[in-house]
Amino acid sequence: MTILSQVFSIFAKSYWYRKIMKKVIYNKIDKRILSTLPPVNFTGKIIVIQGEQEAEKAVEYLMQQEILGVDTETRPSFSKGVTHKVSLLQVASRDICFLFRLNMIGLPDCLIRLLENNYIPMIGLSWNDDLLALRKRKEFKPGHFIDLQKIVGAIGIEDLSLQKLYANVFGEKISKRQRLSNWDHEVLNDKQKTYAAIDAWACIQLYEEIARLITTNDYHFEMIVESGSI
């Protein structure tokens, strides 16, 4: 049996586990499966922040939340030796995502205060890379950050990308088409805004669901074995 047919067979069985028994979690998701999944539907509110006064109000709201999802975007470089500073900081609650346009406002004191806080868990993915990029704009002491890549192994998941993690846990696909778009553009288009918001918001969804599964053991684990590894 090929790896793809094996995966499709397991996915077919998983329907009944999801409906009748437990959620099915796989050690890894074959990338060819991703195209068969429905897209993520983000219904939350997206607010673009382009001024310091707006940033102050946004941070005031965010500092009252129980949990936050975080991510960054940087304008891609297609020339050797050319790099750009981080363009966008996304910070999401469960139903609102703020897009802070750092290329316009830098890292104001209110954002530093948020990033240094030690009591609101801020969930990210491969967050050390984001922190390095942010600290190139302005130095700060990172607060209470939790990296999803460090906890997914607790339920047997080997994949580390956000797209594959979300597909595994929720059976939906996060599109990555906007990743290499121009994040320094004067006006972000709707597709960019939705993409950026989903990446931060999805971190909360994943963290809370993985924490639930760890606590309740309410899942069925399936091992995908690659061809030639047996």
Each model region followed by its residue ranges:
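N-terminal accessory regions of nucleic-acid-interacting proteins
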Residues: V7-L68, L148, W201, R212-F221, ...
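Conserved DEDDh/DEDDy metal-dependent 3′-5′ exonuclease domain
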Residues: I47-Q50, E54, M63-I67, P76-K176, ...
